[in-house]
Amino acid sequence: MPTVQQLVRSARQKITTKTKSPALKSCPQRRGVCTRVYTTTPKKPNSALRKVARVRLTSGFEVTAYIPGIGHNLQEHSVVLVRGGKVKDLPGVRYHVVRGTLDTAGVKGRVNGRSKYGVKRPSDS
């Protein structure tokens, strides 16, 4: 426990937290343009072809973003909205593409968890 005089001399240090998504610059989402759309493989023990995109953000960063859901319509020069959130089995992928906004279409035929994949409520007919 420091004395009052010690605290006068040098105040207590604030604990600084490091951000997990620096490219967003404290914004909830950022717009960007796809520079490359490709598939990559996850680390052991998983096996798949995960769809990812290299995105140039309006903040000036170029990041790798995961494209969630089954099937997508993204290609080079597509304008996308990017949010934070890493993919556990893809090293270096710390961002997600938001489905159903800008040039990104929602997931076709999705019935459950629609809000996460940009799908409107199906009409009852």
From Swiss-Prot:
One of its GO terms (molecular function) is rRNA binding. SUPFAM superfamilies: Nucleic acid-binding proteins. The keyword Ribonucleoprotein applies. The keyword Thylakoid does not apply. One of its GO terms (biological process) is translation. Pfam families: Ribosom_S12_S23 (PF00164). This is Small ribosomal subunit protein uS12c.
